[in-house]
A protein has these predicted regions:
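Asp-based phosphoryl-transfer active-site loop
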Residues: 1-6, 27, 169, 189
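Short glycine-/acidic-enriched loop or helix-start segments at secondary-structure transitions
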Residues: 2-3, 36-39, 63, 117, ...
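Active-site phosphate-binding/coordination module
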Residues: 7-97
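Alpha-helix C-terminal capping segments
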Residues: 18, 40-43, 84-88, 139-143, ...
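A generic structural motif
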Residues: 20-25, 144-150, 196-197
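Residues at the C-termini of beta-strands that transition into short coil/loop
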Residues: 52-55, 152, 203
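Conserved acidic, metal-coordinating active-site core of Asp-based
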Residues: 92-177, 183-185
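Mg2+-dependent phosphoryl-transfer enzymes with acidic/Ser/Thr/Gly-rich catalytic loops
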Residues: 157-217
Length: 217
């Protein structure tokens, strides 16, 4: 979803203030470059000290590609994913069920092309049915060399073990503080949350803004 203009302006000012006192700000997301720019805009994407795309499997700095993973999804994994998703009540609602990205694959039974209303309906349903949790568990069981974690409201991120968001910490120096919305076990923010010095598990832009503006950590 696109970042609200008021939040984007607030965040841009906050990043500028943090840079003045010597802190570095990085974005870590499961989304690819194109989607991230759609969400936050090119100016902010370039302004931060770095943007880790695809769960840390690709790094951009000031718009320049620094490094990226070479992992690709196998035919066997694709077949497994399709077989699982075809059994879902939500399969076929929208397009883009499988989205191959650098170093990972993002899957969604309802499809990333769903409307905002469909997204909310699926998200509410999934909280009760735990469909995504079940799918992730199956993928990990069949492919123990891979990890699968819940991401956002409708999808699952799949990548080689150890190639999750926590890998970005290898590039960090000093104390690290992380903000994420899926920091619980099974979420794609959990690996980095459990290894960082401190983290906030946020549930809305409003909560994130309040913490940024009022917390001294």
């Amino acid at each position: 979803q696109k970042m609200d203009a008021d939040f984007r302006n607030m965040f841009g000012r906050w990043v500028k203030e943090q840079k003045k006192i010597g802190n570095k700000i990085f974005l870590v997301t499961g989304s690819d470059k194109k989607k991230t720019i759609q969400q936050i805009g090119i100016p902010l994407w370039r302004f931060v000290d770095g943007c880790y795309q695809n769960c840390g499997n690709q790094l951009y700095h000031k718009g320049r590609l620094i490094k990226q993973s070479s992992w690709r999804m196998s035919a066997e994994l694709r077949l497994l994913i399709v077989t699982i998703m075809e059994k879902s009540l939500w399969y076929g609602v929208a397009d883009t069920n499988i989205n191959e990205r650098v170093g990972m694959v993002n899957i969604s039974t309802i499809g990333r092309g769903c409307t905002a209303e469909q997204r909310k309906s699926y998200c509410d349903w999934d909280k009760q049915s735990l469909e995504r949790e079940s799918i992730a568990r199956i993928i990990r069981a069949v492919h123990p060399e891979l990890d699968a974690a819940i991401g956002g409201q409708i999808s699952i991120d799949v990548y080689p073990k150890g190639k999750d968001k926590a890998q970005v910490l290898d590039d960090m120096e000093g104390e690290t503080i992380f903000f994420g919305d899926t920091c619980e076990i099974g979420g794609n923010d959990y690996p980095i949350a459990k290894k960082t010095d401190f983290y906030y598990n946020v549930s809305s832009p409003e909560e994130t803004q309040r913490l940024l503006e009022t917390n001294s950590r």
